[in-house]
């Protein structure tokens, strides 16, 4: 020890203390670990696990044991000096680590751990204090005092590792554990590096199990039968907890990090990945092209594809969010090339990109820069036919120009990305056809509501809208059912005053449709009234596409109009009005309803007293529908 000088004490542990020293010959800083117990022979020293393991382990991410010195029955280990440990690095942080730094730290830990496990050892005491650092750029595993050989025989001691990083099989006093306990500790350390707080800070072993259950949820007996055997052996009752989403606990972690963390923290040690398997997770795959494959790299895949046949058709799962704009990928936007579409019509399972998949189907043809489905003549009719069956309508031929996008998922603003392309003529034709179809659909819907056309004839719209409208007609609300009931059993229906043979004339005194807003009616009822006014004006002799003539009395005069609650009186059947040309307009009185009518004076009936003013908001049904005599 006369070749080294001690500077200060760095720390004190269970089995020894660590001093900072310097080599007199080279001036290099070193860490001197002085064991507390005395050793009286070299054979006794060489039997130490730390010496046995570190003699065989030489790796960039494992702290290097430079020398072993026994002097005056005291044993000294000379290690390379590292500035700090991971616990100190976490404690000194006042903000979260960037994910690139965390990925670098975890990669080095798993690299060193894979080397340890490969050489037949497992650490048994992984924690941030035993991971020595030179900043976040360099991390090394240290303190192999509890390390054991994997091939050594159990039983092992059940108090190994610090409680917060102890695997559940060790917490349940298992004596038959192995290297997966190191993988569990790595998962706990990874979560702590992300959040700067321990994931399972239990005050005792049982409290630590409770903390684990609160995060991961109570394991099922089928998921980990050995754990239930261990718990029953120590009379431990599992707390009933539901799992928490790790993304909510660690919001700054990416989805790849959550995937790795979830697998590292599996209850069953057999389901945890090994350290070498964890290094192959997507979390550590950096710099690989996302969705962009060169021609050279695509050749072997194409040959394999030709031998094995085309990939199977996989039905896409419905997206959780609104479907993204599909096939708006344009060569002028290279930044979007790495993002696959979330709602594609024919996704295939695999690592090849969408462009290469289409090139396989096209038997080696070069893929187009955009809209790959334009050149796909074989798949296009089949997929379009299936889409037409799903949507229940026949698409215009010009719609095929945009390939495999269903009409139901295409919004009106989805063509914004195509402004710079020369598709204006076909777009104009499609807009005209769509407007015409929409106007026809609107007219058919109004005619079916007004009973000018049977409901089965509404077939030009989509099947969904037809079903929805028929469902609304078949299952009316309670309010509309009441109206239909009373209107069906009364002789007084809205729209006509039979005393003077009067029908409202929209050309003169009929109020505009927007005046219904003052009466509290919805926009739908006002639109219906405006349509009624149009059809009424048709009856006065103007030309109409619906083909109504002057002598035709439409059936909407016998039904309710929108949500209007007013009533009218029918003319006697013996003397019908000669025509609509002799009808006069009804001028609504201020403060009275629009379709106000006067009672018919019939000889032989007692004259009706004036109706009392109803309470505001209520309908006086007794005055509106008196009993028949």
Swiss-Prot record:
Autophosphorylated on serine and threonine residues. Phosphorylation at Thr-157 by CDK7/Cak1p increases kinase activity. The modification Phosphothreonine is found at residue 157. Residues 309-321 have a biased composition (Pro residues). Keywords: ATP-binding, Cell projection, Cilium biogenesis/degradation, Cytoplasm, Cytoskeleton, Developmental protein, Kinase, Magnesium, Metal-binding, Nucleotide-binding, Nucleus, Phosphoprotein, Serine/threonine-protein kinase, Transferase. Coiled coil: none annotated. One of its GO terms (cellular component) is cilium. GO terms for molecular function: ATP binding; magnesium ion binding; protein serine kinase activity; protein serine/threonine kinase activity. ATP binds at residues 10-18, 33. Its main location: cytoplasm. It is found in: Cytoplasm, Cytosol; Cell projection, Cilium; Nucleus; Cytoplasm, Cytoskeleton, Cilium basal body. GO terms for biological process: cilium assembly; intracellular signal transduction; intraciliary anterograde transport; intraciliary retrograde transport; intraciliary transport; protein phosphorylation; signal transduction. Pfam families: Pkinase. The modification Phosphoserine is found at residue 161. Highly expressed in colon and lung, lower levels present in heart, esophagus, stomach, small intestine and ovary. Localizes to the crypt region of large and small intestine. Changing residue 169 to A: Complete loss of kinase activity and of nuclear localization. InterPro entries: Kinase-like_dom_sf (IPR011009), MAP_kinase (IPR050117), Prot_kinase_dom (IPR000719), Protein_kinase_ATP_BS (IPR017441), Ser/Thr_kinase_AS (IPR008271). It catalyses: L-seryl-[protein] + ATP = O-phospho-L-seryl-[protein] + ADP + H(+); L-threonyl-[protein] + ATP = O-phospho-L-threonyl-[protein] + ADP + H(+). It comes from the Eukaryota. Disruption phenotype: Knockout mice manifest hydrocephalus, polydactyly, and delayed skeletal development. At cellular levels, ICK knockout results in abnormally elongated cilia and compromised SHH signaling. Its cofactor is Mg(2+). Has an essential role in ciliogenesis, particularly in neuronal and retinal progenitor cells. Phosphorylates KIF3A. Involved in the control of ciliary length. Regulates the ciliary localization of SHH pathway components as well as the localization of IFT components at ciliary tips. May play a role in cardiac development. Regulates intraflagellar transport (IFT) speed and negatively regulates cilium length in a cAMP and mTORC1 signaling -dependent manner and this regulation requires its kinase activity. This is Serine/threonine-protein kinase ICK. The lineage of its organism: Eukaryota, Metazoa, Chordata, Craniata, Vertebrata.
């Amino acid at each position: 020890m006369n070749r080294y000088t001690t500077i200060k004490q760095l720390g004190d542990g269970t089995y020894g203390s660590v001093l900072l020293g310097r080599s007199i010959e080279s001036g290099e800083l070193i860490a001197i670990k002085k064991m507390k117990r005395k050793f009286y022979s070299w054979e006794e020293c060489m039997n130490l696990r730390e010496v046995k393991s570190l003699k065989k382990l030489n790796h960039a991410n494992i702290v290097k044991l430079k020398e072993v010195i026994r002097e005056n029955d005291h044993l000294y280990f000379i290690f390379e000096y590292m500035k700090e440990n991971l616990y100190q690095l976490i404690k000194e942080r006042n903000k979260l680590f960037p994910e690139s730094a965390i990925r670098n730290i975890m990669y080095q830990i798993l690299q060193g751990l894979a080397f340890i496990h490969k050489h037949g050892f497992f650490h048994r005491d992984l924690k941030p204090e035993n991971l020595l650092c030179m900043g976040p750029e360099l991390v090394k595993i240290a303190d192999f005092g509890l390390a054991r050989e994997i091939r050594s025989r159990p039983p092992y001691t059940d108090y190994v590792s610090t409680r917060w990083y102890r695997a559940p099989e060790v917490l349940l006093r298992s004596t038959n554990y192995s290297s997966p306990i190191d993988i569990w500790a790595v998962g706990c350390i990874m979560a702590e590096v992300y959040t700067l707080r321990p994931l399972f800070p239990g005050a005792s072993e049982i409290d630590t199990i409770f903390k684990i259950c609160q995060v991961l949820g109570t394991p099922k007996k089928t998921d980990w039968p050995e754990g239930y055997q261990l718990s029953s052996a120590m009379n431990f009752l599992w707390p009933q907890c539901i799992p928490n989403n790790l993304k909510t606990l660690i919001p700054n972690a990416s989805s790849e990090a959550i995937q790795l963390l979830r697998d590292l923290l599996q209850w069953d040690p057999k389901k945890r990945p090994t350290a070498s398997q964890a290094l192959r997770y997507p979390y550590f795959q950096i710099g690989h092209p996302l969705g962009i494959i060169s021609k050279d790299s695509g050749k072997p895949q194409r040959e394999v594809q030709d031998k094995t046949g085309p990939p199977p058709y996989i039905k896409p799962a419905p997206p959780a969010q609104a479907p993204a704009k599909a096939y708006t990928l344009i060569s002028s936007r290279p930044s979007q090339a790495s993002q696959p579409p979330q709602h594609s019509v024919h996704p295939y399972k695999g690592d090849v990109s969408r462009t290469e998949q289409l090139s396989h189907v096209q038997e080696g043809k070069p893929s187009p820069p955009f809209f790959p489905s334009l050149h796909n003549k074989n798949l296009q009719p089949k997929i379009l036919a299936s889409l037409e069956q799903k949507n229940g309508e026949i698409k215009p031929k010009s719609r095929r120009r945009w390939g495999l996008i269903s009409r139901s998922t295409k919004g009106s603003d989805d063509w914004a990305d195509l402004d710079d392309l020369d598709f204006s003529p076909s777009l104009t034709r499609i807009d005209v056809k769509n407007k015409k179809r929409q106007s026809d659909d609107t007219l058919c819907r109004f005619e079916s509501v007004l009973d000018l056309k049977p409901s089965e004839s509404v077939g030009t719209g989509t099947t969904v809208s037809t079903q929805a409208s028929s469902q609304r007609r078949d299952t009316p609300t309670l309010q509309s059912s009441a109206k239909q009931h009373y209107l069906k059993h009364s002789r007084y229906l809205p729209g006509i005053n039979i005393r003077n043979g009067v029908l409202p004339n929209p050309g003169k005194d009929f109020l505009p449709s927007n005046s219904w807003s003052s009466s509290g009616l919805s926009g739908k009822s006002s639109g219906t009234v405006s349509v009624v006014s149009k059809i009424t004006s048709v009856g006065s002799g103007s030309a109409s596409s619906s083909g109504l003539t002057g002598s035709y009395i439409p059936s909407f005069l016998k039904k309710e109009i929108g949500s209007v609650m007013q009533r009218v009186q029918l003319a006697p059947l013996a003397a019908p009005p000669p025509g609509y040309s002799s009808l006069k307009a009804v001028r609504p009185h201020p403060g009275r309803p629009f379709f106000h009518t006067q009672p018919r004076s019939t000889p032989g009936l007692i004259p009706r007293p004036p109706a009392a003013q109803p309470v505001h908001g209520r309908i006086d049904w007794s005055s509106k529908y008196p009993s028949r005599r």
